[in-house]
A protein has these predicted regions:
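Feature for soluble, non-membrane regions of globular proteins
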Residues: 1-202
Length: 202
């Protein structure tokens, strides 16, 4: 079965003023849609067809740039839309809060580490909060549409939170002020969803 562009759980203007409606529309209906169609074309008629996106990325031949770029773009954006919401939704679960404190000292320590990873990612890419095999948390960043599920990336684990720092994610509203966009991102994080994803990996 072909991959499909996921529908959003909210309207394009629902994240304003933190993320503007025009950016959301272009980001979802153009960029994510493009990754979806190009991924389907790249796997058509191959043994990759029919795999879940997670299995496809975990077993990826990293030299296959079409699947690497478009499969990464498909997965990354599908996660991104789920971990943001119109209002800063819910609170951290006790389990996730304790894990954050164990890994980063405090929530503010986590936020500072995550924000630095996002702000200092050179060029296009993503910053992630990942759950490693032992259950501990790690913050890392990846270039372009790479993500921690891919082999040999250097920040292994399952991402439960990600921020897109490609310019198309923020430039209409924030221009070159990436740190302002990162701060605004924290106003729309869906902590209930992030906590649920963490709990599922425990």
């Amino acid at each position: 079965m072909a991959f499909e562009l996921p529908k959003l759980d909210y309207s394009y203007n629902a994240l304003e003023p933190n993320i503007d409606a025009k950016t959301m529309e272009i980001h979802h209906s153009k960029h994510h849609s493009g990754y979806t169609s190009k991924l389907n074309s790249a796997i058509l008629g191959t043994d990759l067809q029919g795999k879940s996106i997670e299995a496809l990325l975990r077993d990826l031949d990293m030299s296959n740039k079409a699947v690497r770029n478009n499969g990464g773009g498909y997965y990354n954006h599908s996660l991104f839309w789920k971990v943001i919401s119109p209002a800063n939704k819910g609170e951290l679960s006790v389990e996730l809060k304790n894990a954050i404190n164990d890994a980063f000292g405090t929530f503010d320590g986590f936020r500072s580490t995550f924000s630095k990873a996002a702000a200092t990612q050179f060029g296009s890419g993503w910053a992630w909060l990942c759950v490693k095999n032992g259950g501990e948390l790690e913050v890392c960043s990846t270039a372009n549409q790479d993500n921690p599920l891919m082999p040999g990336i250097g920040c292994g684990g399952v991402p439960i939170l990600g921020i897109d720092v490609w310019e198309h994610a923020y430039y209409l509203n924030y221009q070159n002020r990436r740190p302002d966009y990162i701060n605004a991102f924290f106003n729309v994080v869906n902590w209930s969803e992030v906590s649920k994803r963490y709990g599922a990996l425990k």
